């Protein structure tokens, strides 16, 4: 194990660049997947004729596919039908598709957890279905959904490492390149240990934030 060689200024800067790409891809994917997941989950909860059924089929299909397969599809299959995405866009698209399906189910379950008595009381007081959904059900449901949503975001951050298969210059990709510069593999343990600590620092911070939010709600 060569810690000194592995942790050279050049290597650390290169690894940090990969970490920034990981955070960027995760951040954009989180925003997009929450947006689409919220729409899909709400429409499934509202049971809009035909549309809800179509979304349910799409969500269940995506949830039962490996994320790696979706990454391959967005990067290698879409160009066959004239849609060519560069590496970062393909990674974000794949993560957004997969995580949107996961989040939509969390959101739908969260909305269903609200007591029907509150909904009936709101409707009897003169509120429309839409008003009841957005002003009574949604605010309460979102508070309950924070812990599982944060957990899903943590999974998303870790899942960015799968984009190494399409050569996204993220943390694991750059760690592999650094490791390849040692003829005897002496960089492997030091460099991947540091990569693991980087993932742990971010994910553990998110976990602590989720726990604190959960405690405040109880």
UniProtKB/Swiss-Prot annotation:
Subcellular location: Cell membrane
One CC-aspect GO term: ATP-binding cassette (ABC) transporter complex
This protein's UniProt keywords: Amino-acid transport, Cell membrane, Membrane, Transmembrane, Transmembrane helix, Transport
Keyword Transmembrane applies: yes
Transmembrane regions: 19-39, 65-85, 188-208
Membrane topology: Multi-pass membrane protein
Domain ABC transmembrane type-1 residue range list: 19-210
Gene3D superfamilies: MetI-like
Cited InterPro entries: AA_ABC_transptr_permease_3TM, ArtM/GltK/GlnP/TcyL/YhdX-like, MetI-like, MetI-like_sf
Keyword Transport part of the UniProt annotation: yes
UniProt superkingdom: Bacteria
Single GO biological process annotation from the record: amino acid transport
Subcellular location, principal: membrane
Induction notes from the record: Positively regulated by TnrA under nitrogen-limited conditions.
UniProt-recorded Gene Ontology molecular function terms: transmembrane transporter activity
Pfam family, one: BPD_transp_1
PANTHER family tied to this protein: INNER MEMBRANE AMINO-ACID ABC TRANSPORTER PERMEASE PROTEIN YHDY, MEMBRANE COMPONENT OF AMINO ACID ABC TRANSPORTER
Described function: Part of the ABC transporter complex GlnHMPQ involved in glutamine transport. Probably responsible for the translocation of the substrate across the membrane.
Family statement: Belongs to the binding-protein-dependent transport system permease family.
Complex and partners: The complex is composed of two ATP-binding proteins (GlnQ), two transmembrane proteins (GlnM and GlnP) and a solute-binding protein (GlnH).
Listed name of the protein: Probable glutamine ABC transporter permease protein GlnP
């Amino acid at each position: 194990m060569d810690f000194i060689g592995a942790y050279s200024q050049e290597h650390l800067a290169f690894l940090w660049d990969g970490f920034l790409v990981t955070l960027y891809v995760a951040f954009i994917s989180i925003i997009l997947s929450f947006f689409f997941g919220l729409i899909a989950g709400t429409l499934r909860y509202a049971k809009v004729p035909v549309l809800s059924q179509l979304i349910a089929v799409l969500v269940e299909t995506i949830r039962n596919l490996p994320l790696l397969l979706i990454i391959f599809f967005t990067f290698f299959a879409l160009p066959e039908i004239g849609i060519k995405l560069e590496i970062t866009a393909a990674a974000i698209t794949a993560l957004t598709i997969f995580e949107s399906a996961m989040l939509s189910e969390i959101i739908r379950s969260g909305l269903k957890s609200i007591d029907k008595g509150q909904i009936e009381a709101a409707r009897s007081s003169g509120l429309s279905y839409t008003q009841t959904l957005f002003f009574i059900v949604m605010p309460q449901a979102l508070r309950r959904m924070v812990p599982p949503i944060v957990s899903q975001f943590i999974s998303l951050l870790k899942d960015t490492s799968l984009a190494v298969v399409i050569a996204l210059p993220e943390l694991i990709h750059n760690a592999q390149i650094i490791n390849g510069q040692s003829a005897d593999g002496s960089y492997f343990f030091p460099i991947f240990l540091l990569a693991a600590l980087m993932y742990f620092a971010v994910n553990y911070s998110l976990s602590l934030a989720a726990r604190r939010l959960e405690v405040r709600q109880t």
